[in-house]
Amino acid sequence: DLHSFPTRRSSDLDEARTILQNIAEGKYNDSQIASLITVYLMRNISVEELAGFREALLEMRVPVDLSEFKPIDIVGTGGDGKNTFNISTASCFVVAGAGYNVVKHGNYGATSVSGASNVMEQHGVKFTADIDRLRRSMESCHIAYLHAPLFNPTLKAVAPIRKSLGVRSFFNMLGPLVNPVMPTYQLLGVYNLPLLRLYSYTYQESGTRFAVVHSLDGYDEISLTAEFKVAMPEKEKLYTPEMLGFSRTTE
């Protein structure tokens, strides 16, 4: 029941799944969805809620089988307030250029000037859900781009509301978790340490080989300005730029 939702400390997995399904089916109006988003500005999302939201989005996705490529997705939550360029998107081209297969899942920016889809669109990429075109892109360029609203009705439905609110929401957390390809590998950047651990818990049971990163000065990626945490299956480690052979810099 969405009406009692704001007064609860958390909901269980099944309730969270039902809420996302109802959004996709148009059972809530824009004001109700905006209120739901606002709840998570006032309290943290639980592991069960995140898992339920994720399950609902994956159940309703348009599935895409590119498993033969054993691809990686490199993605950040955004919402770190740092006004950087699209570092994870640029990284995808570097990795693909090195010969590794990348399946990038992204959207238009909700809290920033430019999301991954804005960048891709400006560079002439034509968004498609055609599996044959995506496969040809992987074969010829080692990269395929999946514009999120084409593959999930919920993400399409909430996009205008997220943009009008202009604040970081739990959909920032969900986007990186619901790549419809279910890639073999994921490198995920998050905007705070609690979310790093939340992602890590979520992925422990998934079979995905993952790493979640957060720079301690607030970036949702590895930076050269501070130490950064990396969470991987069964371990979490603190790194410095110097450990990777880089000089530290100031913002």
Predicted regions and their residues:
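N-terminal Rossmann-like NAD(P)+-binding subdomain of aldehyde/semialdehyde dehydrogenases
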Residues: S11-L58
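Short beta-strand segments at enzyme active-site cores
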Residues: Q32-I33, V103-H105, V212-V213
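A glycine-rich phosphate/pyrophosphate-binding beta-strand-loop-alpha-helix module
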Residues: I37, F85-C141
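Active-site cofactor/substrate anionic-group-binding motifs, chiefly glycine-
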Residues: N44-A110
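Positions that flank functional sites
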Residues: E55, A110, R135, P153, ...
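Glycine-rich anion-binding loops and their surrounding alpha/beta cores
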Residues: V62, T84, G99, Q122-T128, ...
